[in-house]
Amino acid sequence: MEGVFCPLLFAYCLLPTFNLKERLESMLIIGELINCTRKKVGAAAAARDVEFFKEIACKQVNAGADMLDVNGGLPGQELEVLPWLVNIVQETVSVPICLDSADPEALRRALPLCKQRAMINSITNEPARIAALLPVLKEFRPKVIALCMGEAGPPNTTEERLANASHLVDLLTSEGFALDDIYVDGCVLPVSTTPEHGKALLDAVGQITARYPGVHASAGVSNVSFGLPLRKLLNETFAVLLMARGLDAGIVDPCDAQLMANIRAAEALLGRDEYCANYLRAFREGKLELPTAA
């Protein structure tokens, strides 16, 4: 079946009661595939398979990634693996890097290697993590993903997400970070365990972007589908729902052609693609022509 964009989803998303932040900028696509917590990727990192990572970096950028998330989380090896991965990625592609680590020493080793301003994924509203990461953030001044998780663990409600977001935004701005450098991640959790997780995040994203004009909203979209069949279908749908609430950065699989086509269509329909330039470019490049089933 040909990939289609569902107008009913947009009708739901754009009800007048929703407080949608008006933006013109397109989505920041952060490629998620260089993640050593994934079995195949971790094995390639353990074997120091340079060609594997060159290929996966190129594939993501060619598919439309604006930035690459790099997770070097091999047990006991992150201090060596993260800088190694940064060097490989930068030798291969020219996009900035999002360093996916909570280890301050690993970040201290990797950040000076970044040729462009990096992003850190992520700081949370946990005192121990703040104490560990804040000195590194202040020294190197990267862009920052502020994950709405506190000492009690992952948030269950919209209100918990808002409380964590407020504390983190206030903390970072008090330390001199511009709102434009802060990407609030409302914490995507699987709907397979708690069906309300999806709606709670949607409401939180809308309220965060309304409360803090200038702050970006990001999400690790694929977490929502964990434990369910046809994960790509859920990821593709959820990304569009989030965009209608104000999401402007996503850690996603850019090699998912349907997801990327949906994002380009959503940008055009939400007024975030001036003169539909990105949509038309994707059309000319054949990126909207999805395979059809026999």
Regions found by a protein language model. Give the residues of each.
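Catalytic alpha/beta core domains of metabolic enzymes, predominantly
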Residues: 132, 140-277, 283-284
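Short polybasic linear motifs
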Residues: 8, 15
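Alpha-helix-loop-beta-strand connector modules within alpha/beta enzyme cores
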Residues: 78-115, 202-217
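Active-site mouth loops of central-metabolism enzymes
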Residues: 30-55, 121-124, 151-159, 224-232
